[in-house]
Curated annotation (Swiss-Prot):
Alphabetical GO biological process terms: intracellular signal transduction
InterPro entries reported in the protein's UniProt record: Kinase-like_dom_sf, Prot_kinase_dom, Protein_kinase_ATP_BS, Ser/Thr_kinase_AS
Protein's name in the database: Calcium/calmodulin-dependent protein kinase kinase 1
UniProt modified residues of type Phosphothreonine: 108
Catalytic residues, chain numbering: 275
Organism per entry: Rattus norvegicus
UniProt xrefs under SMART domains: S_TKc
Annotated tissue distribution: Mostly expressed in the brain with higher levels in cortex and hippocampus. Lower expression levels were detected in striatum, nucleus accumbens and cerebellum (at protein level). Abundant in forebrain, weaker in cerebellum and also detected in thymus and spleen.
Keyword Transport in annotation: no
Sites bearing Asymmetric dimethylarginine, chain numbering: 78
Length: 505
């Protein structure tokens, strides 16, 4: 039998080294499938490969994790200093040209779009690395997100699509349960998720100094989560309620001017916010207030939104929103009421109507008059404005345009606010913009999230705080106004969920 020239010329010592290396590598990689390391014929001694593993293990211990679905995943998760970084050997990425094709392709398995970090509580979605939790609410949580491409931090709100579809803004609320849609209705009815995408496309195009900017939205089709990326405002909410040191009257006036301009801009875009309150008003670096958190907002058609559902925070709800009459009510007037409650909080550090029980709170909102404490003393003009904003009749309640002209707001005309035409321009979106309003995360991101849960030995939502159920309540503000700090920079979340109270679902 003839032997090939390559085999005849092979050094016996090299052949021995090859066999020893094959046995050693097989022992180290017995849990992985793949090509036999000895097939290359020039493997170095096993100590060369071991040296590339031990230093990495000393500086960054390899976490012990269960294998989930495929070998690709374990390769993607391989820590720094592993055999993928060896300069020689069957899995090296060095200049050797005699490696097996399968071994050569292994480094390309690692994705730069979706990956999971070895650090605790860190998941990466596309270019965003999710870090600590900075807020929470009834519809999801807010996490600090680091954009590696831009070297910049954002706030990523993780929302439940099921809850979003139930409460998110539609042109009209769906009919009551059990009723059927009328025959011969509108020519085109958008699917629920399409309606959400349409409104997201509008929110992405909103551009106003007093409205928080929505950067982009990521969607994982295989999961319930929807990820909204917002500008990060590190100064946080304008105030936490209750507050022992409320704002001076002049500071409250300046903040109200910002809120009214932002609210007028939203109404111009045919959006009602439905959850105006101090924790949803964030301070920018320039000291101006920005309206945030559109989790229960509504888009409307015509001159005003005609609403029939209850949403928002109980202590900030208008009487008509909690009425048992079943009649529809104005969305714009709803926002004015909530802004009036917010203004009251600014100067008194608490809500005008307080009770630990939801039914008692509703009764006070609908029936009791607004009471002004003796301290701190405020001007009669401010009291007049608050009473007009907290008019229990939405038909006679003051509107945004009249608030802008109120003597307390303008200092009797000395500081007029810009007209609607000067600071509002209607945003229109095309079908293409609606189509591209949400970026889809590759479906195998689900596997990454599952791996994160397995690593934490928890099968719950990795973004959901454990104490959420303990803090949820329908009463307000008593048990719901958890924090007592106030003032600028009380905390550093952008778009926190709900702190005065969680939005009612």
């Amino acid at each position: 039998m003839e032997r090939s020239p390559a085999v005849c010329c092979q050094d016996p010592r090299a052949e021995l080294v090859e066999r020893v290396a094959a046995i050693s590598v097989a022992h180290l990689e017995e849990a992985e499938e793949g090509p036999e390391p000895a097939s290359n014929g020039v493997d170095p001694p096993p100590r060369a490969r071991a040296a590339s593993v031990i230093p990495g293990s000393a500086s960054r211990p390899t976490p012990v994790r269960p294998s989930l679905s495929a070998r690709k995943f374990s390769l993607q998760e391989r820590p720094a200093g592993s055999c993928l970084e060896a300069q020689v050997g069957p899995y090296s990425t060095g200049p050797a040209s005699h490696m097996s094709p399968r071994a050569w392709r292994r480094p390309t398995i690692e994705s730069h779009h979706v990956a999971i970090s070895d650090t605790e509580d860190c998941v990466q979605l596309n270019q965003y690395k999710l870090q600590s939790e900075i807020g929470k609410g009834a519809y999801g949580v807010v996490r600090l997100a680091y954009n590696e491409r831009e070297d910049r931090h954002y706030a990523m709100k993780v929302l439940s699509k099921k809850k979003l579809l139930k409460q998110y803004g539609f042109p009209r609320r769906p009919p009551p349960r059990g009723s059927q849609a009328p025959q011969g209705g509108p020519a085109k009815q958008l699917l629920p998720l399409e309606r959400v995408y349409q409104e997201i496309a509008i929110l992405k195009k909103l551009d106003h100094v007093n409205v928080v900017k929505l950067i982009e939205v990521l969607d994982d089709p295989a999961e319930d989560n929807l990820y909204l990326v917002f500008d990060l405002l590190r100064k946080g909410p304008v105030m936490e309620v209750p507050c022992d040191k409320p704002f001076p009257e002049e500071q409250a006036r300046l903040y109200l001017r910002d809120i009214i301009l932002g609210l007028e801009y939203l109404h111009c875009q045919k959006i009602v916010h439905r959850d105006i309150k101090p924790s949803n008003l964030l301070l920018g670096d320039d000291g101006h207030v920005k309206i945030a958190d559109f989790g229960v907002s509504n888009q409307f058609e015509g001159n005003d939104a005609q609403l029939s559902s209850t949403a928002g925070t109980p202590a900030f709800m208008a009487p008509e929103a909690i009425s048992d009459t079943g009649q529809s009510f104005s969305g714009k007037a709803l926002d004015v009421w909530a802004t009036g409650v917010t203004l009251y909080c600014f100067v008194y550090g608490k809500c005008p109507f307080i009770d630990e029980y939801i039914l008692a709170l509703h009764r006070k909102i609908k029936n009791e008059a607004v009471v002004f404490p003796e301290e701190p003393e405020v001007s009669e003009e401010l009291k007049d404005l608050i009473l007009k904003m907290l008019d229990k009749n939405p038909e006679t309640r003051i509107g945004v345009s009249d608030i802008k002209l109120h003597p307390w707001v303008t200092k009797h005309g000395e500081e007029p606010l810009p007209s609607e035409e000067e600071h509002c321009s209607v945003v229109e979106v095309t079908e293409e913009e609606v189509k591209n309003s949400v970026k889809l995360i590759p479906s195998w991101t689900t596997v990454i999230l599952v791996k994160s849960m397995l690593r934490k030995r928890s099968f719950g939502n990795p973004f959901e705080p454990q104490a959420r159920r303990e803090e949820r309540s329908m009463s307000a503000p008593g048990n719901l106004l958890l924090k007592e700090g106030c003032g600028e920079g009380g905390k550093s979340p952008e778009l926190p969920g709900v702190q005065e109270d969680e939005a009612a679902s």
